[in-house]
Design a protein with these regions (language model features):
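Aromatic- and carboxylate-enriched substrate-binding clefts and catalytic-loop regions
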Residues: 188-203
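A short alpha-helix capping/helix-coil boundary motif
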Residues: 156-159, 199-201
Length: 203
């Protein structure tokens, strides 16, 4: 089951493709101050999954993450923000549920870092939509989440082949030279991806 809770005046992100009525009852599981902060009391055995593209392990507990896309080429163990923001978490423990924070601004996730028994989520402003998802198990919760955000497209056949990418290709000749070298070495090559060098001022 998915329930939608609206706070303030959210900016439409179009992340959710399914129309849904706003719930009238109190937000379950999470305590909020109605200022953009959401707290959840973590039990000793709770495991927290999610947040998509992030450094560190699959269990996000014990660290701070920031949803504020950051083009940092030097990824380290203490990095808190990467290229993408995926504000979905799934908690497995005494209570199992998912939460998606549909918000276009900066969000901070303190998942048992400051206090081991507390997960604190902060949005820069209290203008967001929170979706609470419950189900039979973790797989069911993720399936429901994927349904509301839209399923991924099926990749083309060539995308399963070998691709080459790196920062630093400046010209068409650079790309052709890479392809020629792969061919000379007898290494199959299905695609060459360009990094930001071809863009005007990297945009």
């Amino acid at each position: 089951m998915i329930k939608k809770y609206v706070f303030g005046t959210p900016f439409p992100t179009n992340a959710v493709v399914t129309e849904m009525e706003t719930a009238k009852d109190k937000l379950p599981f999470l305590e909020t101050d109605n200022q953009g902060t959401f707290n959840y009391a973590l039990s000793e055995n709770d495991i927290v999954y999610g947040l998509g593209e992030q450094i560190r392990g699959i269990n996000k507990r014990g660290w701070q993450y920031v949803s504020w896309n950051y083009d940092n080429p030097n990824h380290h163990e203490d990095t808190r923000s990467l290229y993408g923001s995926h504000n979905f978490i799934l908690i497995r423990g005494d209570v199992t549920f998912g939460a998606f924070f549909d918000y276009a601004g900066k969000m901070e996730f303190d998942i048992g870092y400051t206090r081991r028994d507390l997960m604190q989520i902060k949005a820069a402003k209290n203008d967001l939509v929170v979706y609470i998802i419950t189900g039979e198990n973790e797989k069911d919760i993720v399936k429901q989440f994927r349904k509301i955000i839209g399923r991924s497209y099926i990749p083309p056949f060539w995308a399963f082949g070998y691709g080459q990418s790196r920062w630093g290709y400046k010209t068409e000749q650079d790309i052709r030279e890479v392809a020629k070298r792969y061919q000379a070495a007898g290494i199959p090559l299905d695609s060459i991806y360009l990094d930001i060098d071809y863009m005007e001022r990297y945009k």
